[in-house]
Every structure is written in C-alpha cells, then in structure tokens.
Amino acid sequence: LSHASQNYICHLKKKKRIDLKGWRIGLYHGSPADHKEFLFDNTSDVRFRELAIDVNADVVITGHSHTPYHKHIDGVHFINPGSVGRMFDGNPAASYALIKLSRHELVVQHYRVPYDVETVVAELQKQALPPIYVAMFRQGKKLN
C-alpha cells in the first residue's frame, strides 16, 4: 500500500452510524462492543442477542473476521460482507455484499469474485514477508 493509503486506513473511525431510508445502520470494524472482537457466522446467537440489546441499530455491518454472513437476530440484521483479498473461510475468492434497502425491507446478497491470487503472492514475495502470508492468500484461511 502507498503511504497515502496506509495513512487513510489508519485514520478511519472504529465505528460510524448512518441513517438511511429509515434504517439505523452501525458500521464497525469488529463488533459494536469491541473493535477487536471477531464475529463469525457460527458465533453463538446468545452473543448476537447480547449485542442487539445495546446496539441501538437495525443493521450492524462488521468486518474483522473477513467471513461473509447475514444473521437476523432479535430485530437486528448482522452483516459481514467478507473481504476483498484476504479471506478466512477457505475460499480465496474476494467477497462483498450488496445490501438493498427499501422502507420496509432489507435484502442482502453476498458475492464471490475470483482474482489472480498468484499476482498477490508475487507481491508478497517481493516484500519478503514470511511464507505464512503466501499460504494464507492461496488457501483463503487465517493461519496466524
């Protein structure tokens, strides 16, 4: 990444709230409770219920786990679009989500897009990063 890109990423807020078409949307890196907390599709519903109580949002969009999912728990939609580049679910294809909102309906569609992983691997090798990073990109898994 360029220094400008690194600087931009480092200065992003850890959370943000937006209101759109009558929906209260919270954007978080990790969870609403902790930006370092991993939320996965197999995280217990009990944990999602705990978060739903305090979040004051209709939609919670997270990242951090790099794992795509959509759960609707206690009136709150929990969505993770996945990751464009470094997946953790065993599929190296990039992942994103398209969220369609109307006043009374929310529809989430997840998409996977293959990309040339070997081009990324070549760049990683140029940077002399440990071999585990090459393995992670090729396997689409978190290995560290």
Briefly describe each language-model feature range.
Residues K13-R17, T67-P68, Y96:
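Short, acidic/polar N-cap/turn motifs at the starts of alpha helices
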